Amino acid sequence: MLKLLLSAALTLGLAATPAFADESVACPAFLDHDLPKLHSKDTVNLCDLAAGKPMLVVNTASHCGFTGQFKGLEALHQRYGKQGLVVVGFASDDFNQEAKTEEEAATICFKNFGVTFTMIAPSPVTGANATPVFAHINQQAKAPRWNFTKYLLNEKGEVIERFGSTTG
C-alpha cells in the first residue's frame, strides 16, 4: 500500500494540503446514482459523498487472497480522508470470490478488518452488466482483471491511475 499512498499523496498534493475538495467542480453523471451500501438498507450517492474530491475506487471480494489489503485501504482512508480523499469499495462476485451473503461479507470487511470507508453492496464491475461507475471507469482504463484493482480518480471523475491487484 506504500506505493499507493505515495502516489495518491503526490499526485493529488494531499500531503501538504490541509483539506482538498473543489466544491465548484460539477459531479460527473456516472457518479450520480443511489448505490446500496453493503449489508444495509441505506444508499449512498457518490456525488454527495465525493463531489469535487479525489476518490479511490476498489473492487473487492471477501474470500480473495488479497482481502488483507482492506487493512492498507483503511490506513489510506484514515490518513488522507480528512484531507479529502474518498475511498469506496465495491464488493463484487465477478471473480467468484465474494461471500455467499452480504452479512458474511460485512462481517469480513467491518469486523475482521475494521473497514470504516464506504462499501457498496455486491455488484458487477466488468462486462455489459457493470455498474454505471465501473462501466465509465472501464472506458477510461483497463477493466479489473481480478479483485482489488484500484482506480484513483481526480476531482472531475477522471481516472488518473490504475493499480492492479498486487499493489497493496
Language-model segments: residues:
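Bacterial N-terminal signal peptides
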Residues: 3-15
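N-proximal helix/coil linker or "cap" segments that precede and/or mark the start of modular domains
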Residues: 18-33, 50
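Rossmann-fold NAD(P)H-dependent dehydrogenase/reductase core
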Residues: 26-43, 66, 128
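A short beta-strand-turn-helix
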Residues: 33-54, 75-80
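Loop/turn elements at helix/coil->beta-strand transitions in domains of secreted/extracellular proteins
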Residues: 51-55, 81-86, 113-118, 147-148, ...
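Amphipathic alpha-helical repeat scaffolds
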Residues: 59-63
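Structural microenvironment flanking redox-active thiols in thiol-disulfide oxidoreductases
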Residues: 66-130
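Thiol/disulfide oxidoreductase modules built on the thioredoxin-like
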Residues: 113-115, 124-168
